[in-house]
């Protein structure tokens, strides 16, 4: 097995908190210098690199003299604001040693959920890469709330991979890669060298392995790889403790776990529908509707909906689930939740009688839906 990084021209590298901080107590400047050197080597080989880096909150806590990470949202946001200054300064200094410029990009889920802002972010990042700049991306913790948070930088890394249509995502952690079970609890766990990113068995294997410094366990990395695969990107989960890990991956050396994309690349708008929108509710489908969407990619008609969950407006994103609760698709609805409850199980010709008007014959048109 050879690493896919060797043949990848555009790469997103996510570096976890434990790899850039002193056990969560401020930034490890030597570690940042090392990552700058590694990325500079990839750049020397002609690769475009985006770096997704944690560390702002840990640095903020250090600067504010807090020995214990706070639990309050506003205290965490304050720490992020203070720490982001240090993170930017440290990376700017580290990359300057290799003749490279950096750019700071702070994102929230809301930025990518809005189609116009999504396209603007893609254009900006593409321009920076073409200017030979290294974009350094982090979640905008200072303003992010639970409704607009990505939740972890593994997810952010995958969404950025989709956004810029990168060839590969490298998730560097303090673990060797993916095992059949948590090796810290199961010494006989088998190491997984390669698998398909969409293999559902991976989620069962992932468990909750993860360091105490960041917010992401191994399960978030599996889900990130699944998201990245929708744009055709492979994911490598590897230990950031490995010497010269990025250079060796670029040489083709098999390090860590490689999760390959087994499905065809989704169209850009379908990727946006699949991963960048917050879900406002759920539609429960009957067996016929679920089968039609899975096998033929049809639009969803009201007659195929057996129940409506949540409160949503026209144009918001909802999940479509089958009788077993498995997500079949997600899409943008043509009717609000109140309207949907009035027209569910009804044929198209009965919509006007139920509502007094008809907006569209479909509850979700196939052009605004992505099958999962």
From Swiss-Prot:
Keywords, ordered alphabetically: Amino-acid biosynthesis, ATP-binding, Cytoplasm, Kinase, Nucleotide-binding, Proline biosynthesis, Transferase
Ligand binding (ATP): 14, 173-174, 215-221
UniProt keyword Zinc present: no
GO annotation, biological process: L-proline biosynthetic process
Disulfide bonds: none
Pathway assigned in UniProt: Amino-acid biosynthesis; L-proline biosynthesis; L-glutamate 5-semialdehyde from L-glutamate: step 1/2
Keyword hit for Amino-acid biosynthesis: yes
Name of the protein in question: Glutamate 5-kinase
Organism: Chromobacterium violaceum (strain ATCC 12472 / DSM 30191 / JCM 1249 / CCUG 213 / NBRC 12614 / NCIMB 9131 / NCTC 9757 / MK)
